[in-house]
From Swiss-Prot:
This is Sulfite reductase [NADPH] hemoprotein beta-component. Alpha(8)-beta(8). The alpha component is a flavoprotein, the beta component is a hemoprotein. Keywords: 4Fe-4S, Amino-acid biosynthesis, Cysteine biosynthesis, Heme, Iron, Iron-sulfur, Metal-binding, NADP, Oxidoreductase. GO terms for biological process: cysteine biosynthetic process; hydrogen sulfide biosynthetic process; sulfate assimilation. Pathway: Sulfur metabolism; hydrogen sulfide biosynthesis; hydrogen sulfide from sulfite (NADPH route): step 1/1. The gene is cysI. GO terms for cellular component: sulfite reductase complex (NADPH). [4Fe-4S] cluster binds at residues 434, 440, 479, 483. It comes from Escherichia coli (strain B / BL21-DE3). It catalyses: hydrogen sulfide + 3 NADP(+) + 3 H2O = sulfite + 3 NADPH + 4 H(+). The keyword DNA repair does not apply. Binds 1 siroheme per subunit. Its EC number is 1.8.1.2. GO terms for molecular function: 4 iron, 4 sulfur cluster binding; heme binding; metal ion binding; NADP binding; sulfite reductase (ferredoxin) activity; sulfite reductase (NADPH) activity. It comes from the Bacteria.
Amino acid sequence: MSEKHPGPLVVEGKLTDAERMKLESNYLRGTIAEDLNDGLTGGFKGDNFLLIRFHGMYQQDDRDIRAERAEQKLEPRHAMLLRCRLPGGVITTKQWQAIDKFAGENTIYGSIRLTNRQTFQFHGILKKNVKPVHQMLHSVGLDALATANDMNRNVLCTSNPYESQLHAEAYEWAKKISEHLLPRTRAYAEIWLDQEKVATTDEEPILGQTYLPRKFKTTVVIPPQNDIDLHANDMNFVAIAENGKLVGFNLLVGGGLSIEHGNKKTYARTASEFGYLPLEHTLAVAEAVVTTQRDWGNRTDRKNAKTKYTLERVGVETFKAEVERRAGIKFEPIRPYEFTGRGDRIGWVKGIDDNWHLTLFIENGRILDYPARPLKTGLLEIAKIHKGDFRITANQNLIIAGVPESEKAKIEKIAKESGLMNAVTPQRENSMACVSFPTCPLAMAEAERFLPSFIDNIDNLMAKHGVSDEHIVMRVTGCPNGCGRAMLAEVGLVGKAPGRYNLHLGGNRIGTRIPRMYKENITEPEILASLDELIGRWAKEREAGEGFGDFTVRAGIIRPVLDPARDLWD
């Protein structure tokens, strides 16, 4: 489809100010170190406001009290969000205990937020605690480097507790890819870890002096689970196994979900299949994809800078041929693979290594001690006795991994007493939201705070129509940037204004089809009225095993998105 619309390999024109900022930053140093010592403001100023993102942080403020503080002639209550680099979501219990302590003692909100990028975030870090958080992470072998802005972000890997050997191999590749694509600048170590400046010239052989044109996301996925939502990502390595052993990857490039309301030059896009590669070429191919996007990505318009737009501009075959040239390989034909689901298997699963794995449902990934549900304390107690590790899933849940039979009852007791194993409906298990208000500066409508009561209402509709044992993949994102991955849901709500959302329908359960907007700028009662009617029809008219999204397409309720670059907005 893309070959009909070839365009220039490099977009000429005035570069965005972000490109100026990166070029002048002295390899991401800026004046962050000096800004840290400025006690007159709780935030970072000028270019540093954006540069700290390369160091894994976003400057935010509490939007619930923004107007009140403005009336009092006070600056916004600035605080940082920090996102950890955690390839594949694996974290040791020692590391967990350290982040639990920091969250409780040094953040405004006191919580740990699991994200659908398979890592954790701290919200509400005051400026005085910014350096200590990086030093705490370093002390337990973690960092926040390259988890935001124009770099390869946290690398995802399917959380598959059953196929323990295959997961271990895939996870190792996720770590290798993450390390290979990290920036080489010593700015992070100098600013946060007080490491000495080395008298050598900085070089960025892969990312370049101005880094990537836009954010870049990578996954390693183990079929038949598509829990990491590969089509939301720029570069995806689909594991191909023979006799339970990893032999190579299918490569898919150019997925991405972010759009802008009303801007038809923006669109969500599923990733394109490039071909199969043996394991030994993995890092060379990863580097070739990244450097091709580095050189060809649009640096004149950040809203059109991601890999998906580059593919559509130059053509899939042209981009693929350049990757082959740079990597020195020829892709083999795609090997067969299929996806059957995206959800986590909540509860106990026994692995082929005879260890047990307990997947805990964490609503919206928010770990905090609630009345009668001390989730944070419960997980801390488990971390103190568990000999295995924890694994954060791309569905914002947590796996207590590698539990021997002898420890199973002890861990289950703590989990149950802490409310970590409370029964939830299949619908709630398969619903997700981004953070949105009060901390996200881009939020247009509620998401995390909206979802629990919204799902109460959806559960009532499911019961009304006799489908309580079923689920619809349902997601809410507070703005069209799409962190909640609503643009791969069967039912996606995209925030438009306070209390109002665009309702998207027609995605599928396995995450391989983009949903289309069904109704625009509507309220929760209007959303529920529409879904009441549609769930009722699905319950009565569906075919055997037919998911809600597939039904809405087959029944003619919504047209499927076949070529999102050209028909998403039709």
